[in-house]
């Protein structure tokens, strides 16, 4: 574990030297992990980052073949509504116009977390275990990718059941979802402008499907690009520090919204909604740590949530939070 200044300087040092490394940064940036890839053998960490991995595919064969069974025990709507109302009041008063409200849901699942890692399908996956933490995630969301001096980010906001007739048209024309997506795109453009120049939106509001064990979801995404400022070219630690927490999992305006999240959620998010990624000596790939299961003692909890705006309906947001509790094993 590294302290905040340490992880920034360590990442900057590794970048200047072209040293390959993995990073796992928690939401509060209190317990960041930055490790050379050559050091990973001594840690219980497995990753799959857009095709880059540190394990043998055949290892999944050691687990028994069985059908996934997951039971959700979500909080009551009344508990959710109390938190939602606090967010809505702040938005009515102009303190925030987008806030990502999250909860942890107790679940019962017949797979271990490491088994979930090996058997799940996702663009980004991570299994992590140490003396205090054990979690697995299977995230569809890119944080930033850096290639040849260009940064790309792909904010995801807007979700619908893909099996609904006309789902894509409904999603793209939903006033609340469109407003939420536009807000997070604008927020991430602003975040990129801190570390980049020539920031532009290459693609706005396109959709893609993700598979779950309950069916398919359709999500709305955009692509934003910028060129890294020359003074930050070999300072990945500073780039990440200036952009965290990820805009898509907090809201806007960022500073005020972070305070409202703190007073509303009443618990630390920890590694959930942080970021992780890999630097290969030249380029960087990273993901937002969502679709997240953690184990505390004998109990498992699934973390999920969604963006709240003035257009939000509490029951729909509650249902979306529960709908996002899935494991992509099929």
Question: Can you annotate each of these PLM segments?
Answer:
Residues 1-330:
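Extended alpha-helical targeting/anchoring segments
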